Amino acid sequence: MTLPARTEVVVVGGGVMGTSIAFHLAEAGVEVLLLERDALGSGSTSRAAGGVRAQFSDELNIAIALRSLEAFDRFHDRPGCEIDLHKTGYLFLLDREEDVRVFERSVALQNEHGVPSRLVDPAEAKRLSPLAGVDGVIAATFCPIDGHASPESVVLGYAAGARSHGAVVEPGCGLTGSRSTAERSARC
């Protein structure tokens, strides 16, 4: 393995976050080197269930989630990989009145930002997810644009996309140290 002598950005970690950063920077014309000490996607991404959702309780996370869902919808075109995206919806089951009040406010905020979430009763929750146990459930929230995708496919798609834009992606190469120089660059 021969690493470049110079690069503009070093991304450490080859999971969903690192490969996404590498892809977007490389696509924007930035010289990128991505280092992953093990296999791509072998860290926390390897333990992710792949859930994707827009049901959050604050404006920032709702906005980020909506952008992510849009990106996942177009992933087969950009960066160009199938990620096994299924918009099956996401159901939160609630069994405490105080949680229902919190989720009612969250649903109102989500709706203000274009998220089609809604509060449902236990019978509709059971209809939406027949295997869900609804004993003790007093309400639920559901959003049909939520779902799941393959985290491994997302990682591999972003890594391939980053490479296609000139990034150097090096699995099996961990960062063991760095130091800053007067030019505000790092030496590894």
Give the residues covered by each predicted segment:
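Beta1/beta-strand and adjacent pyrophosphate-binding region of the FAD-binding site
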Residues: 3-17, 33
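Gly/Ala-rich phosphate-binding loop of Rossmann-like dinucleotide-binding domains
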Residues: 22, 26, 161
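Glycine-rich FAD pyrophosphate-binding loop
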Residues: 26-46
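Conserved dinucleotide-binding and phosphotransfer motif residues
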Residues: 28, 113, 164-165
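Short loop/edge segments at beta-strand edges and connector loops
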Residues: 36, 121-122, 171-173
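Dinucleotide-binding Rossmann-like beta1-alpha1 core, especially the glycine-rich loop
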Residues: 50-128
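A short, glycine/Asx- and small/polar-enriched loop/turn
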Residues: 98, 131-137, 179-186
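Helical element adjacent to the flavin cofactor pocket in flavoenzyme catalytic cores
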Residues: 141-188
